[in-house]
Swiss-Prot record:
The developed two-site sandwich ELISA assay to quantify this protein in P.acerifolia pollen extracts could be useful for the quality control of allergen preparations intended for clinical use. Could be used together with allergen Pla a 2 for a reliable diagnosis of London plane tree (P.acerifolia) pollen allergy by skin prick test (SPT) in most patients of the cohort of 47 tested with a sensitivity of over 90% and a specificity of 100%. PANTHER family: OS02G0537100 PROTEIN, PECTINESTERASE INHIBITOR 12. This is Putative invertase inhibitor. Monomer.
Amino acid sequence: MKLSFSLCIFFFNLLLLLQAVISADIVQGTCKKVAQRSPNVNYDFCVKSLGADPKSHTADLQGLGVISANLAIQHGSKIQTFIGRILKSKVDPALKKYLNDCVGLYADAKSSVQEAIADFKSKDYASANVKMSAALDDSVTCEDGFKEKKGIVSPVTKENKDYVQLTAISLAITKLLGA
C-alpha cells in the first residue's frame, strides 16, 4: 500500500513536470518564430512577457495571441497613467501637446486591441491582424510626434518600444495562425 501511494505521488509530480516543460516549449517555440519573423520583437522580451502570465503555461497558439494582446492593453494603460502624471507637472506646452496626442493614440490603440481579442477568440485572424497593426501604428505615431519639433525629447520612448514589441508579438501570432 505504501509503495502504491509513493508511485502515485511520483507519477503526479512527473505529470506536473512534463506540463511545465511542454508549456515552456510553446512559449519559447512561439517566441523563437515570432522573433525570427518580426524585427520589432526581442526573443527574451517575448519569453519573459508571455511567460509571466500563468495562463501561458496551458495556452495554445491562439491563447498566446490573446495573452499578448491583453498584455498590450495593460501596458498601454500604464503608459497613459505615466503620461497623466507627467501632464500634472509643469511641462513645456509643446511637450504637453505631444503627450496629449499620445493619450488619445493609446485610447484608440486600446479599442483596436480589444476588438482584436474578440477576433482572436472567433478565429478571425485576418481582422485581428488589421487591428493589431493599427495599435502598433498608434504607438509609433506617438513616438514620432516628439520628433516633429527640434529640442523635444520623448519621455516615453522605452514604454513605446515595449508596447511595439507586445503588439508585434500578437501581430506575428496572427500570421502564424494563418492571417
